[in-house]
Regions:
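Hydrophobic alpha-helical segments and helix-packing faces
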Residues: 158-162, 170, 174, 207-211, ...
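Outer-membrane beta-barrel and related beta-rich outer-membrane complex signature
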Residues: 191-195, 242, 275-277
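A mid-sequence, solvent-exposed acidic-amphipathic segment
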Residues: 181-234
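Cleavable N-terminal export/targeting peptides
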Residues: 1-42
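Transmembrane beta-barrel domains of Gram-negative outer membranes and organellar outer membranes
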Residues: 25-154, 161-165, 171-181, 185-186, ...
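Structural motif marking the loop-to-transmembrane transition
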Residues: 5-9, 177, 223
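Charged helix-capping and loop-helix junction motifs
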Residues: 210-212, 244-248
């Protein structure tokens, strides 16, 4: 199946960004006289991720997070697999705030039996010295342990590795609206060939190992505890023969005491960066999206 580029970016901008920006203009006008100048803006995002895309939020110094994330199967099969609930992919993540500007994590995912580790660090904060946005760096490394030496006799450890680097740029426009832009570069040391339904090679994988993307996302606060979240990542140099799609995720956050519960629909099965950025197969137009959730507990 050949990949067809679709205009999800335009649809996203029209359906989600434009209405929220219009609302933000009203919020800004009503709050412009009450917002202190030269003061760091807090809580652009309440959770460490918007949905799949990392947010500019960091853990506070000394805070320890335990995060359980699930992605179920696509809903397209209906009751055959109970709308995807029979096919769960799970990620367990441990995250720690080293200090106010540095957060680290390690995680294990069922998708390709992947282990990943990452660092996230604040470079600039919105409001400090009247700086207009928050800028955060994010670097991750993932190890695919699903690859077996019996299938790949020349397999070496470096073949299991993939890397991602993102610059997360966010602005809190009002108490309700926050938006983020995420220029991204990622590299997969191993790209699997394209196979047919019998696992026979159709063609060598045409994708370049080093890939580029741009992510956009936002949060709109509905009530004191509820918010609407959406993120989308456009791949910028995907091979025309690729079967993979751009990840689009839509959901809600619920804040309850010491944890945040995120519920969403997404066409991405993987939860680590190089997985959802480069290996999303779901097509929203064909019902190939899944229910998922992230449960974030702070200690």
């Amino acid at each position: 199946m050949l990949f067809k580029r679709k205009s999800f970016c335009k649809i996203f901008m029209v359906l989600f960004i434009c209405p929220l920006v219009l609302q933000a203009q009203d919020d800004l006008l009503s709050e412009i006289d009450s917002v202190p100048k030269n003061q760091k803006v807090e809580s652009a995002f309440k959770s460490l991720k918007i949905v799949n895309l990392e947010s500019t939020k960091l853990a506070a110094k000394g805070d320890f997070y335990f995060i359980v994330a699930h992605r179920f199967g696509f809903v397209e099969n209906g009751f055959d697999d109970f709308f995807g609930l029979d096919n769960a992919n799970t990620q367990l993540k441990f995250l720690y705030g080293v200090n106010e500007w540095l957060t680290v994590h390690i995680a294990r995912s069922g998708f390709q039996e992947t282990y990943d580790a990452a660092v996230k660090y604040r470079l600039f904060a919105q409001g400090e010295n009247n700086f207009p946005v928050t800028i955060v760096g994010f670097n991750s490394i993932a190890v695919n342990t699903e690859l077996k030496e019996e299938d790949y006799p020349k397999l070496e450890f470096e073949n299991r590795l993939s890397f991602a680097t993102q610059i997360l740029i966010s602005r809190k426009f009002s108490e309700k609206l926050s938006l983020e832009l995420a220029p991204t570069i990622f590299h997969e040391n191993t790209l699997r060939d394209i196979l047919d339904e019998n696992n026979m090679v159709i063609s060598p994988n045409p994708q370049e190992n080093t890939q580029y993307a741009i992510g956009i996302g936002g949060r709109y606060k509905l009530t004191k505890r509820w918010s609407f979240n959406v993120d989308y990542v456009a791949h910028l140099n995907r091979a025309s023969e690729s079967i993979y799609k751009n990840p689009l995720s839509i959901g809600f956050d619920l804040e309850t005491g010491g944890h945040v519960f995120q519920m969403h629909f997404t066409n991405a099965t993987a939860m680590h960066e190089t997985g959802y950025l480069g290996q999303t197969v779901g097509d929203w137009g064909k019902g190939e999206f899944a229910f998922g959730f992230n449960l974030v507990r702070v200690f």
